[in-house]
Structures are given as C-alpha cells and as structure tokens.
C-alpha cells in the first residue's frame, strides 16, 4: 500500500506530487500513460507559463521541466508508460505496463490529475476517411 497515488503526470499531477511531498507525505507514486512526464505542457510551445510559480515566463516544456527537476530531488516514484484501467471504491488502482505487467496497487489516497486531451479529427467532425494533410495542433507540434 502507498500513501498517495497520482494518476497523471501532467501539470496537475506534477504540482500535486510536489505539494504532497512538501506537506510531508513520503510514499507517493505517479502513474503516467505517456513515455514522459509533462502531459499537455509538452505541446504548449508558447511563453506564458511560470509567472506565478517561478517568477519568469517559460514555455510549456520548460515549465514541466522545472517540476520534473523538483521531483528528482524527492523520493516520489514514477511509473511511465502505464495505463490505468480501473480505480475501485476501496482505493485499488488496476494498471498495466510493459515494465511491471498487470498490477493492483492499493492507496490511502488517490489524486486524479488526468488533465485534458485534444479532440480527435472525428470528434470535431472533419469529413472524410483519409484527410491527407489535416493535422490537429497537437499532432503537428509533435513532428
């Protein structure tokens, strides 16, 4: 059993982990489905992040990087490339990853920091089955 599981390693999850550590929790686990921490911040290449927290303008990846560096100074554990399948009322998190396989992890507390996702081409009603050259903003920023 862990004290705190944070589902999502984006801005909310990173901030929650840092604050929980600052507040004295020591057995903290972040479960992130992507291969890296940062979430949507990794797609936000414009300035404007960090004014309140760090006193300077940062891009999304720079802002995420600051939190990631802060986490490295703690004992917060991170499992990347981990898909959460279910969260039960008795605070058991069912998840799966290549590295650890299928796991059921029990927690005293759970924070849901799953954030936002860009809607797919189909969800926004882009017509056709093969719209060559049509990319969402998030897809374009990845390449």
Across the structure, where does each feature detected by a protein language model lie?
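FAD-binding core/adjacent interface of flavoenzyme oxidoreductases
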Residues: 1-7, 65-143
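Beta1-alpha1 glycine-rich phosphate/pyrophosphate-binding loop at the start
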Residues: 2-62
């Amino acid at each position: 059993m862990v004290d705190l599981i944070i589902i999502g390693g984006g801005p909310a999850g990173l901030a929650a982990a840092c604050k929980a550590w600052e507040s004295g929790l020591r057995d903290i686990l972040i479960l992130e489905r992507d291969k890296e921490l940062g979430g949507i911040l990794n797609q936000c290449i414009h300035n404007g992040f960090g004014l309140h927290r760090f006193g300077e303008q940062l891009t999304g990846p720079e802002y995420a990087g600051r939190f990631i560096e802060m986490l490295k100074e703690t004992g917060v554990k991170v499992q990347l490339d981990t898909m959460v399948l279910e969260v039960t009322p008795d605070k058991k998190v069912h998840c799966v990853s290549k590295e650890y396989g299928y796991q059921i992890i029990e927690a005293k507390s759970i924070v849901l920091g799953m954030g936002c996702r860009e809607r797919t081409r189909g969800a926004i009603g882009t017509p056709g089955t093969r719209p060559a050259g049509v990319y969402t903003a998030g897809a374009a920023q990845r390449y």
